Amino acid sequence: MDRDLVERARRGDQEAFAELVHQVSDTLYGVARRILRDPGLAEDVLQNALVTIWRKLPGLREPDSFEGWAFRILVRACYADAPRNRRWTTTVRVLPVDRASDEDGLTAISDRDELERAFRGLPLDQRAVFVLHHHVGLSLVEVAEVLGIPDGTARSRLFYATRALRSAFDAGRDRPALQEGQLA
């Protein structure tokens, strides 16, 4: 991240802020979408986070920490705006099984759907750690710093998220295959 660009944005330069947003918005949106699992909600949360970033930017003490600081604001916005007791919708698919050549493809779809359901079932704090570590590529120390939590907490959240995903994936492999006309 260009330190000069962050400094200019901190001083109220709207063009500099627009350039910062251009540089980080795709990554921030990807994080929000992966945490929330809802593209529309992710867009709304991103917009709210960008407004907060603009308002709080003059108070940013260290321009080199802009990205981590922006991630922190975004994740907090995800926590605040996520529907607390929402029941996640399930994707409905009709899966053909009469063709042997489709078997591997069906298994891949089934595996992906199992992981998606399991991921949606994770608490938001575990999803945030998982996404920041595995999708953004932050180290666990960086994840802890971004989220403002101890390193050990980041490690345990990642451990429990990974364990839950692995259990759900393994449980899905024990289910019988769906026949054509059945709903996934």
Region locations from a protein language model:
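A short, charge-rich alpha-helical start-of-domain segment used by transcription regulators
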Residues: 6-30, 127
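Amphipathic, Lys/Arg- and hydrophobic-enriched alpha-helical face
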Residues: 21-39, 56, 119, 171
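Structural recognition of an alpha-helix C-terminal capping motif at a helix-to-coil junction
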Residues: 30, 44-51, 55, 64-76
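Arg/Lys-rich amphipathic alpha helix in sigma70-family domain 2
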Residues: 55-62, 72-93, 108, 160, ...
